[in-house]
């Protein structure tokens, strides 16, 4: 395995992905509609960069004026594709299978979802899927037609939010920088929330460090049997 790992990395060097659209109530809102999609599908590797919040340089993102209405308590689906122009949903249309790691999702309450950059505090994690029985969260998305299901907590306050959906690829993470962070932000108007619970929050950048065991890790050798997902715990009602 020590010999094969560099070959795996070389073959997967250009295999990237984009959170291209959001599905709500079984209806896909459209590519780039309410989601700030980039013109390039590459990763962010510097966890101290402002681009770790909602993507950005070196991957310029396109503004969108749409704010998607979502009801608290429902499950939305972040749809991932290799490129914005990718129309299929086979595993190779999502992300290279070598890109193993967790999936995560965060929310941030904002005054205006179309203008807030996402940089700074206010983020709380609402979903994570790491390593379970030898299968990674990214593998479940890749083999599930690019569908990343995210439940919106019913107990949060109504209002406008940014939804940050993320896939983390660890095939090159034995050194830092090396882990590949893929994320985009959707612009939401969440209705029907009770506001009965206030989440603890973290900042982007700031939530991850290059020394975190879930960021700097060799997933090939010795074989990984457990994995610590980076960032805070998942907020629950």
Curated annotation (Swiss-Prot):
Its main location: secreted. Lignocellulose is the most abundant polymeric composite on Earth and is a recalcitrant but promising renewable substrate for industrial biotechnology applications. Together with cellobiose dehydrogenases (CDHs) an enzymatic system capable of oxidative cellulose cleavage is formed, which increases the efficiency of cellulases and put LPMOs at focus of biofuel research. GO terms for cellular component: extracellular region. Is able to utilize various natural phenolic compounds as reducing agents. Most of these reducing agents are present in plants, either free or as lignin building blocks, such as sinapic acid, or as flavonoids such as catechin and dopamine. Phenolic compounds with 1,2-benzenediol and 1,2,3-benzenetriol moieties yield the highest release of oxidized and non-oxidized glucooligosaccharides from cellulose compared to monophenols or sulfur-containing compounds. InterPro entries: AA9, AA9_LPMO. It holds the Pfam family AA9. It is an enzyme of class 1 (oxidoreductase). GO terms for molecular function: metal ion binding; monooxygenase activity. Its cofactor is Cu(2+). Cu(2+) binds at residues 16, 99, 182. Disulfide bonds join 54-185, 155-237. Residues 1-15 form the signal peptide. GO terms for biological process: cellulose catabolic process. Its EC number is 1.14.99.56. O2 binds at residues 171, 180. Lytic polysaccharide monooxygenase (LPMO) that depolymerizes crystalline and amorphous polysaccharides via the oxidation of scissile alpha- or beta-(1-4)-glycosidic bonds, yielding C4 oxidation products. Catalysis by LPMOs requires the reduction of the active-site copper from Cu(II) to Cu(I) by a reducing agent and H(2)O(2) or O(2) as a cosubstrate. Shows oxidative cleavage of beta-(1-3, 1-4)-glucan from oat spelt or xyloglucan from tamarind seed, in addition to cellulose. Belongs to the polysaccharide monooxygenase AA9 family. This is AA9 family lytic polysaccharide monooxygenase C. The gene is LPMO9C.
